[in-house]
Amino acid sequence: MSKNVVVIGTQWGDEGKGKIVDWLAESVQGVVRFQGGHNAGHTLWINGKKTILRLIPSGIMHPGVTCFIGNGVVLSPEALLKEIEELEAAGLDVRSRLQISEICPLILPYHIAVDQAREARKGEGKIGTTGRGIGPAYEDKIARRALRVQDLFNPALFDEKLAELLDYHNFVLTQYLGAPAVSAAQVRDQAMALAPAIAPMVKDVSSNLYAMQQAGQRLLFEGAQGALLDVDHGTYPFVTSSNCLAGAASAGAGVGPQSLDYVLGITKAYTTRVGSGPFPTELVDEIGTRLATIGKEFGSVTGRPRRCGWFDGAALKRSVRLNGITGLCITKLDVLDGLESIQLGVGYRVNGEFRDVLPYGAHAVAQAEAVLEELPGWSESTVGITEYAKLPAAARRYLERVAEVCGVPIDLVSTGPDRNETIVLRHPLKG
């Protein structure tokens, strides 16, 4: 029996992590975000009602669960408070159940200005960021110049650090990117106006998570984006600016790695990608359009259409190794309903040689030709099925082949957007 579970996306994000975290949150006392910012949305459907969370952990939907934003998250005070207000308007108690690490780096207006100006300057060569300032905020963190949440409550120190930051960022904006400068007074006034609303939620998250573990309580660590977008191990440079792997939960929440008992890898039954970057199994035909239409493949935060393709087992194998995945959850199986045949990526041809795992770096991946294996499809609907034996035989064979290719068992299968539309083969927290 596992006490603490890490939920990770194994592809290029958008795998359906939010629903699964929400479902698992019924069995834990705390849910922790440990990386990313408000650039990724987790979509939940509860009794037919749609909720999109960007910063706040998906456990907020459960009254008895405490939610944490760990130090690995870059925090926009404005985006946070807007999301809190939206949830409160829907009748949820948020502020008494949300704790924010005092050492989270802040996202401020100059980060957004730099992010958007850079993308505009690159034109067709752009990375495809969301333009929300995530990357520049992480840059400040690594350069050891970031303003952090705790600085909001020390105005003199805030002003001192802000002056130095804007000397640098305004030089880049005006002299290199050809964009307007950002006003220090406006940044300061906005931040100081928001600080009192945030103050009661600011805590020593690491210590509080330690105390919960000492009391025998269970924790769920909620990853954002996906392993193939990891800044180190993803299709660099077409990646996000943080580490999206299971190991990042330790550093990004302030807990010891021995606290991570089980890693659940969330995997779509096909593959999607948003924005630029190589995609070996991409479909640019009517089947790709069908997957996008039936799967409603549009970003929950940006609204951008997602590129669609066949399931890539060799890419999943890379994710399995990087994350030490214990078990898989396959989502959106129902999107494949009605296809006469289905193809599954088992490797690549690279310079005439077969490779059974995704290469490193965007250039190498772009040179890789997917090796596909054809399996029979199924005509029956899988929507809402909650027992594995009731799935069509061809759907079961497809899932079994996925597990064979990546070498990890499938513990959960999602057959619809609602939390109850789930097949449980092995419960991550109950065995």
From Swiss-Prot:
Q: So where does Mg(2+) get bound?
A: 14, 41
Q: What class of enzyme is it?
A: ligase
Might you give the EC number(s) for this enzyme?
6.3.4.4
Cofactor requirement:
Mg(2+)
User: From the Swiss-Prot or TrEMBL record, what is one GO molecular function term?
Assistant: magnesium ion binding
Give me the segments passing through the membrane: none
Q: Where does this polypeptide localize?
A: Cytoplasm
GO annotation, cellular component aspect: cytoplasm
Which residues hold GTP? 13-19, 41-43, 306, 332-334, 414-416
- Residues binding substrate are 300-306
Alphabetically sorted, this entry's keywords are: Cytoplasm, GTP-binding, Ligase, Magnesium, Metal-binding, Nucleotide-binding, Purine biosynthesis
Q: SUPFAM superfamilies of this UniProt entry?
A: P-loop containing nucleoside triphosphate hydrolases
Summarize where IMP binds, as residue positions: 14-17, 39-42, 130, 144, 225, 240, 304
Give the cofactor note text: Binds 1 Mg(2+) ion per subunit.
Q: Which GO terms describe its biological process?
A: 'de novo' AMP biosynthetic process; IMP metabolic process
- Active-site annotation: 14 (proton acceptor), 42 (proton donor)
Q: Which reaction does it catalyse?
A: IMP + L-aspartate + GTP = N(6)-(1,2-dicarboxyethyl)-AMP + GDP + phosphate + 2 H(+)
What pathway does the annotation place this protein in?
Answer: Purine metabolism; AMP biosynthesis via de novo pathway; AMP from IMP: step 1/2
Q: How does it assemble?
A: Homodimer.
Cited NCBIfam families: PRK01117.1 (NF002223), purA (TIGR00184)
| Family recorded in the similarity comment | Belongs to the adenylosuccinate synthetase family.
Cited function = Plays an important role in the de novo pathway of purine nucleotide biosynthesis. Catalyzes the first committed step in the biosynthesis of AMP from IMP.
Q: List the protein's name.
A: Adenylosuccinate synthetase
Q: Which organism is it from?
A: Bordetella petrii (strain ATCC BAA-461 / DSM 12804 / CCUG 43448)
